[in-house]
Amino acid sequence: MSLPEHSPLGKPSAYKTEYDASLLFPIPRQPKRTEIGLPEGKPVPFFGVDIWNAYELSWLNLKGKPQVALATFIIPSDTPNIVESKSFKLYLNSFNQTRIASPEALQQLLHHDLSEATGGTVQVRLVTEADLGKQQMGELDGLLLDRLDIEVDRYEPAPELLFADQDETPVEETLVSHLLKSNCLVTGQPDWGSVQIRYVGAPINQEALLKYLISFRNHNEFHEQCVERIFMDVMRQCKPVKLAVYARYTRRGGLDINPFRTNFNTAWPDNKRNARQ
């Protein structure tokens, strides 16, 4: 099993400039799911995607001229593995001096390698120079929790803070906070994010939810793992009928990671970059 501490994170790395798919370092999802009460071999109560955006992708055409593009990778949450982010960066950098016939050929190669590493089918989208001006930005929709004037003293995940008023009429609500911060599981470096919680069910106490989200501030876990922990904690403590959790993290090493988990059929998020990304 590939363990996070064996990944390139936190270690000096040689930057290869010739294509090398072996640089990708997969990490199994299951150990962290077991940690949040989801045993191996049983269905998980959510589905979704991890949306990765790469801003530093370059290669050479067959004449040796550099090419650049943005790339989006959509990794289903039911793949057995995630990819450690520094290894992803090193892998993408390995294309820098690699001659490739066309963007379509690169897209096919990326699809193959990421699908092999994650154990599933990864969608790859490239945005070449001609279409860069068409890229849109947008903020997460919803009622902003950060408006609340609260006192905070918990900085490790505290699901017991969460509660909903089960005696009230069910509501359909979308809540947003930009105060999510967690830390890399291996290096402890800060990860900054915005999070959107959509649900149908008994009204979730908003002050409690904001305190809970802030409680991740000193927690060490990868982005995908944090979102799944949030999903499970809200489900168990507040018991909504429908729940979707979406986080957009700021980029590091030319990559941003945006996990989405839901228990009901809905369109995947539109992947608009927010101002902090």
UniProtKB/Swiss-Prot annotation:
Presence of the UniProt keyword Oxidoreductase in the record: yes
The species this protein was found in: Cupriavidus taiwanensis (strain DSM 17343 / BCRC 17206 / CCUG 44338 / CIP 107171 / LMG 19424 / R1)
Keywords on record: Cytoplasm, NADP, Oxidoreductase, Queuosine biosynthesis
Name this protein carries in UniProt: NADPH-dependent 7-cyano-7-deazaguanine reductase
Pathway participation: tRNA modification; tRNA-queuosine biosynthesis
UniProt family annotation: Belongs to the GTP cyclohydrolase I family. QueF type 2 subfamily.
Pfam families assigned: QueF, QueF_N
Chain residues that bind NADPH: 85-86, 252-253
Listed InterPro entries: GTP-CH-I_C/QueF (IPR043133), NADPH_dep_7-cyano-7-deazaG_red (IPR050084), QueF (IPR029500), QueF_N (IPR029139), QueF_type2 (IPR016428)
EC number per UniProt: 1.7.1.13
Cellular component, GO, one term: cytoplasm
Catalytic residue list: 184 (thioimide intermediate), 191 (proton donor)
Location(s) in or outside the cell: Cytoplasm
Keyword presence, Calcium: no
Residues that coordinate or bind substrate: 83-85, 223-224
Higher taxonomy: Bacteria, Pseudomonadati, Pseudomonadota, Betaproteobacteria, Burkholderiales
Protein purpose: Catalyzes the NADPH-dependent reduction of 7-cyano-7-deazaguanine (preQ0) to 7-aminomethyl-7-deazaguanine (preQ1).
GO biological process, one term: queuosine biosynthetic process
Molecular function GO terms recorded: preQ1 synthase activity
Predominant location category: cytoplasm
HAMAP family: QueF_type2
